[in-house]
């Protein structure tokens, strides 16, 4: 392999693709999760209990789950740039439209429609990156992509808190300004996507002929060794036990990602009631700054050492243990520090997980597998927010719900160790089938 050709190609991709993809995901995550900040004002204006808020937060995932796999199947047929552009334009319109709701039912409907519009975006981007990046660079690429999500909280939470201060401007509530102003960028970027992204390396005019040839040959060689590949269709994903085991792990991890993210400002406000909404949003953003750091370090170290198992399983298990300590800590500062580390470690496995997954699946079956895994994980978003809200209404505390999250993370970490070891073995031996191993 020509090291200069390898380095120059990857560097060009990192400059051209990754920053743009990070911005797209940053906007996506802000629009999906800004309801957590809006709730600081919106719940009172719409007379919503914690359980009703949980329903509004969770109903997004009903449609998101239903349309996830079909969306990714369509993406493989019409091309990534067209479909991702469509997703962003429609979700931008709906996200901004949430500023018009007058009742909890209208909010439920708009959140449901937001899930329809956004379905397929995350797995679509993951599939897109797997079509460009060789295995040796994939975990780092995935970590940079998901840093966009963590940055959405680092930047988006304080930004959303600031927008709430527009309350009363032109007679409009702050949370309505929040939905309106944060929905517009998605619409505009959706148009840019169509003209900026290329569907495949072969079509990338910004790569030289030699770079295009090398990258295409490298990816084709790796894909030929992949268990679920171009010679399978989307139905293969539903029949492969390995895909379902990966789905279980991602579901357990999602209890932490979704459960904590959607309620973090409310949790912080509950223990720091004297703080302003802006300061609450800042305190809620700090854990995601650590998530950015942990994801990059864990992803890069995994690529350099070519080790997946410990990088996948250990952070989750430690995150679960730290969350349990935070729950029972009597010191608020210590509890907050432990919560920060919990969030960071929970997110740290993200690039490793998708590197392991995309080392196993490619093609139409791969796109469907990625979408299926993501859809199953989002069941946590459907079920857990209403349950978490109900627990808060009944017990006046989130502790019982957070214990569930901690146990899910510990169990998920144990599964991650097993999956990581099996994946390392299969990649090393270049096996052609995974179904016999599960």
Question: Which role does the model predict for each range below?
Answer:
Residues 35-36, 235-296, 350, 354, ...:
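Extracytoplasmic gate region of multi-pass secondary transporters
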Residues 47, 79, 100-106, 117, ...:
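Helix-breaking motifs and short loop linkers at transmembrane-helix boundaries and internal kinks
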Residues 66-105:
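Conserved MFS/SLC helix-loop-helix module at the cytosolic interface between two early adjacent transmembrane helices
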Residues 67-79, 294-307, 392:
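Helix-to-loop junctions at the C-terminal end of transmembrane segments
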Residues 76-88, 303-316:
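Cytoplasmic membrane-interface "Motif A"-like loop-to-helix N-cap segments
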Residues 110-147:
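Cytoplasmic helix-loop-helix junction between adjacent transmembrane helices
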Residues 140-164, 185-186, 374-384:
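Glycine-rich segments within core transmembrane alpha-helices of 12-TM secondary carriers
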Residues 306-356:
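C-terminal transmembrane helical hairpin of 12-TM major facilitator-type secondary transporters
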């Amino acid at each position: 392999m020509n090291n200069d050709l390898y380095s120059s190609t990857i560097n060009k991709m990192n400059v051209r693709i990754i920053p743009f993809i990070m911005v797209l995901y940053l906007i996506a995550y802000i629009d999906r999760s800004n309801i957590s900040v809006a709730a600081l004002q919106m719940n009172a204006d719409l007379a919503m209990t914690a359980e009703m808020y949980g329903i509004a937060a969770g109903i997004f995932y009903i449609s998101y789950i239903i349309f996830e796999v079909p969306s990714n199947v369509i993406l493989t047929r019409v091309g990534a740039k067209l479909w991702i552009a469509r997703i962003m334009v429609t979700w931008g319109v709906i996200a901004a439209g949430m500023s018009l709701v007058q009742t909890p039912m209208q909010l439920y409907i708009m959140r449901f429609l937001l899930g329809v519009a956004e379905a397929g975006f995350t797995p679509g981007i993951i599939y897109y990156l797997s079509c460009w990046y060789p295995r040796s660079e994939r975990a780092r690429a995935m970590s940079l992509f998901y840093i966009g999500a963590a940055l959405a909280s680092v930047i988006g939470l304080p930004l959303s808190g600031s927008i709430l201060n527009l309350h009363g401007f032109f007679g409009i509530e702050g949370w309505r300004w929040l939905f309106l102003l944060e929905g517009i960028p998605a619409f505009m970027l959706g148009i840019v996507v169509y003209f900026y992204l290329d569907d495949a390396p072969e079509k990338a005019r910004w790569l030289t002929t030699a770079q295009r040839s090398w990258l295409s040959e490298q990816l084709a060689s790796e894909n030929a060794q992949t268990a679920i590949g171009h010679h399978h269709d989307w139905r293969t994903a539903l029949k492969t036990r390995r895909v379902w085991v990966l789905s279980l792990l991602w579901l357990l991890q999602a209890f932490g990602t979704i459960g904590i993210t959607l309620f973090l400002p409310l949790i912080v406000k509950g223990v720091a009631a004297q703080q302003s909404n802006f300061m609450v949003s800042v305190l809620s953003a700090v854990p995601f700054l650590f998530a950015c750091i942990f994801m990059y370090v864990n992803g890069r170290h995994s690529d350099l050492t070519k080790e997946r198992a410990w990088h996948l399983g250990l952070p989750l298990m430690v995150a679960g243990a730290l969350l349990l300590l935070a729950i029972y800590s009597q010191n608020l500062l210590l509890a907050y520090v432990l919560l920060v580390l919990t969030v960071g470690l929970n997110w740290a496995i993200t690039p490793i997980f998708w590197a392991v997954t995309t080392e196993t699946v490619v093609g139409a079956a791969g796109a469907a597998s990625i979408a299926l895994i993501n859809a199953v994980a989002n069941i946590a978003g459907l079920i857990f927010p209403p349950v978490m809200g109900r627990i808060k209404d009944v017990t006046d505390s989130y502790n019982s719900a957070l214990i569930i999250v901690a146990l899910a993370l510990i169990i998920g970490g144990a599964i991650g160790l097993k999956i990581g070891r099996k994946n390392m073995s299969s990649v090393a031996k270049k096996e052609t089938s995974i179904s016999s191993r599960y």
